[in-house]
């Protein structure tokens, strides 16, 4: 029997029962729960343990059906709050708290209420901030930290990142947004100026040849199409970035190259070949980053703009390099030559990879 919960303003207790490999759950009211326990003790069980805030109890049933009840008092624990069955998700940016850039970007109104049609964007922004929250210990509080966001687009997430790190968490951050669309850059700089975000700047340019900084603490790349993601990742490694957050898209390169006789029954179907190629591309990227001294994870990221769900590669610099041999064997077996592999090896040979 589990803990209390509130369903439609009625306090219920949940019981779980295992039948074979299935776990069945059922909710009971107080009276129904007592009847359920009595029935189970009479028919199926000989011992019942209960834990309470002040008293713990044990009910023992003999073979003849005699019940013995033992009680033990203990210090009162902190009161446990009854959980709502459908509890509200606790977001980092909370509904009801007006945030200037979310208002101007049409995600919420001036009272802080989320616009219904933009709720998916609100969830996406908060999910992204959760990824950042996990890596906060890697960001220094003793100096200014530099974050470069390539492919910032309309910059929902760039503004959210600045607001979260500087306004909510108190980090001294300098965030640089790069994009190839001039009109987007002008609008974002105008908004940053309006909000007084003095260390948030947007520039027209490509991360592959960006030389505006010599050292970057975190690189964010969202929806850099196809091999643009690889150039961004290679640049991040070159800078020795402590953290990399990347949401790739349009992974076409491997789809054009992949050949493997054993996998031909799968690869002959276009849609399966496309999906497999995308997954292989991101797995290889993560493995290559590990070979350059990063600990990597591939996580699910909500993204309504491109696909219902997407993947995010999160890499944290450890300095411990993994063996690249297994990756190279797989690349050879699949006849693929990823751009990131070439870029990282070129940088290694030039001696510029840290």
Task: Map each language-model feature to its residues.
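Class I S-adenosyl-L-methionine
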Residues: 8-31, 35, 65-67, 76, ...
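Short, small-residue-biased leader/transition segments that mark boundaries at the very start
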Residues: 1-7
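Conserved SAM-binding loop of SAM-dependent methyltransferases across substrates and taxa
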Residues: 154-170
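Conserved class I S-adenosyl-L-methionine
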Residues: 143-153
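Conserved Class I S-adenosyl-L-methionine-dependent methyltransferase catalytic core
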Residues: 52-145
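Phosphate-coordination loops involved in phosphoryl transfer and adenosine-cofactor binding
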Residues: 144, 172, 216
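Short helix-capping segments at alpha-helix termini
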Residues: 167-171, 194-197
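Conserved SAM-binding motif I beta-strand of class I
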Residues: 172-179
